[in-house]
Amino acid sequence: MLKIYLAGPDVFEPDAIEQGERLKALCEQYGFTGLFPLDNEINQEGTPYEVAKRIREANVALIHECDIVLANLNPFRGLEPDSGTVYEVGYATALNKKVYAYAKDHRPMIKRIVESQSLSPSATHCQDNKVIENFGLPLNLMMLDILISVGFEEALRQLKVELNDV
């Protein structure tokens, strides 16, 4: 069975362990083995920095172990995805892993920024006077071509079809 690393801010949900179990169960239904970051047993002793470093190293080890990364790129604490998840996507890409993602909102980012900041529809800069990337994409251009669906299960269905066609 192919192993899928389940990247995303799901680890911050109040029921994160149960959420991870649900995601892994869905992976099994589609013939995959899900690897959830909270599967790692982390020694909680030491400074916050030391614990954080162990968490990072354990998650990186799961990325090395997996065949595919499936990332939840839904907005997290703002309009953009979780920065840790984005790091994991980049890391997996550098390892030549297959990387796919899902997010509910596929509207171009410029439209979402204009709407959330009540800007003119013709705005080219956000409230912080930074240029708003306008390639018609829902995420930064570095995420080009990895966004395959609006939800987790739909992404698994698409992966199953795509991998069976190979």
Regions found by a protein language model. Name each.
Residues M1-V166:
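Conserved catalytic or regulatory cores that recognize and/or transform ribose-phosphate-containing ligands
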